[in-house]
Amino acid sequence: MGKQFDKKITWTIKNFASLLSDLIYSDHFVVGGCKWHLRAYPKGYNNANSLSLFLGVAVPTSLPSGWRRHTKFRLTLVNQLSDKLSQSKLNELEQWFDEKTTNWGLSSMCPLNEIHAKDSGFLLNGELKIVVEIKVLETIGKLDVTEETSTITETVDVNGFQLLPSQAKSVSRMFAKHPELASDLRPKNPNLRTGYMSLLLSLIETLSQLPQQMSKDDLLDAYDALGSMRDAGFKLDWLEKKLYEVSEKKENEEASETGLQEMEEELKDMKQKCLEMEALVEKEKAKVSTAKAPISFDDIV
């Protein structure tokens, strides 16, 4: 059975409550050889009381006359406190996009008072998150861009870091345990911030290995990486403590291995001596048995 959707994109809208624009767009993403984007009306489209949200062809003018895209998609307003409360307003809707219909969606995605309600879960740290899942079922007209040559990368915003979806869960858990982790981080460039976070995840992955899988060079590299991240402003006392524990375990493991090898060699020598001693005992037993044997009449005569 094929995948229900080809791609899943998360759009994070920052400072949603203070947006002044009537219309905002997501970055472009590529599905089925076509550039798409999401467009949102934070104050509502012909409905001032609801968030309006649409999926659209990003650059329709780049497509030839007569182009069409038969598409199935789903829009979800994410509840950041509870997956069960996330609102899926469009469920597997199928729509033909063409020159006359370049956008399709809902003028009333969700009431604004529900979004802004205290502890509703839709706004967290001023951020609103929207997910679109999309599958292109049929294409008429040449492709304007191929999936293979696209440089667009799907990312998810986690506490101001643009990360791969595969990294998001681990980083969210890390911030939940250590909320001050990046409060003093100096680099503001998104690429640098992402690079530092990837380095931090790699370091944690290294420390998660079994002691026998790590070399002394790995530990030296880990200390260098830790120093670099602390210089950048990360608060990593908890990780430094863990690195020390891992280093200590590595030293204990190496010392134990050395001691174990010596004990095994000693045990081997002792076993050999036992075998030799057992042979001597058997030999002496034979002598004793011979000495104790009675002398027969034939032996005397």
From Swiss-Prot:
Q: State the UniProt keywords alphabetically.
A: Coiled coil, Plant defense
Following inactivation of the gene, the phenotype reported is: Susceptible to systemic infection by tobacco etch virus (TEV) and to some isolates of lettuce mosaic virus (LMV) and plum pox virus (PPV).
Impact after mutating E284K = In rtm3-1; susceptible to systemic infection by viruses
Q: Which residues form a coiled coil?
A: 235-289
Residue stretches making up the MATH domain: 6-134
UniProt entry tagged with the keyword Coiled coil: yes
Please provide the Gene Ontology terms (biological process) for this protein.
defense response to virus; response to virus
Function summary: Required for the restriction of long-distance movement of the pathogenic tobacco etch virus (TEV) without causing a hypersensitive response or inducing systemic acquired resistance.
Assembly: Self-interacts. Interacts with RTM1.
Q: What is this protein called?
A: Protein RESTRICTED TEV MOVEMENT 3
Q: Give the organism the record lists.
A: Arabidopsis thaliana (Mouse-ear cress)
Gene transcribed to yield this protein: RTM3
